[in-house]
Amino acid sequence: MRIISRSSGYASALLLAGTAALAAPAAAQASAALPGPPVVPCSSSALVAAIQQANGARFATLLLTRGCNYVLTVAAPDDGLPPITGNLVIIGSGGTTISRSSSAGNFRIFDVAGGRLALVNVTVANGNSGNQVGGGILDEGTLVLRGVRLTGNTAPSGAGLDVQNDAHATISFSELDGNNATGLAGGAIDNSADLVVDHSRVIANTAHSFGGGVFTLDPGTSRITTTVVARNVAGRTGGGIFNTTGATTVLIGDRVVFNSAGSGGGIFNGGTVQLRFTLVAFNSPDNCSPQGTIRGCLR
């Protein structure tokens, strides 16, 4: 899987810069060994401590233990992990997971609190933010997800991911599935800022009211490319995608299929939606609503 960001090459530069900074040799000798990023032991307390330390650095890269499930049991107070205020790359492998214990109280997993986070090859699971938005991740900074799975997270809105307050989020080669917005909108994603989704899957998420898959709220802009949005459910409108008045959603080379809602089973549009080489079909009870608001979409 490959990672991209809203500006070409940003995430790659981020990763390379961080690796170079952390791997600088102690002495300028060609034969000197280059130290690599630290590997975080398979312990939730170790992960918390590593992020706390990383927040104080100019840049940090953390390698997670291969195949580990970092099970979080306590919050501080709304998040299982320290809010991301620095410039941090977290890399997993072999099925690395960060999850909330099913016996723990309610808290989300990550809060990007004005910092920058690149999360690579990690599953984020079972976050529950209670009466706060963003069950899995709340993005209030810059977020890059590559090869990430957001699954089984719960929140009133933005159960998998909530993007707000002039934040930026780029998701590539990732999957958002089985997330549940219990209050209003955005089973997988609630976006009121800047969102890019590329080569990903938004599958089988639910929202109590609006946008079972992706909910884009004024003044948000969502750009979704080469992505499958399927089998999502909204209790009222916008089973796959809901785009509000003042918001913009651009879909390029996507498939929006087999979603369902009271109306706008595929897409509900109150603002601006552009379809380019995108299939919107087999949604229930209709593909797009209100009729005529999305050029190229058959009702």
Listing of model-derived features with the role each one plays in the protein:
Residues 42-45, 59-87, 96:
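N-terminal extracellular ligand-recognition/capping segment immediately after the signal peptide
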Residues 41-43, 49, 55, 67-69, ...:
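Sequence contexts marking disulfide-bonded cysteines in secreted/extracellular proteins
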Residues 1-32:
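Secretory targeting and sorting signals
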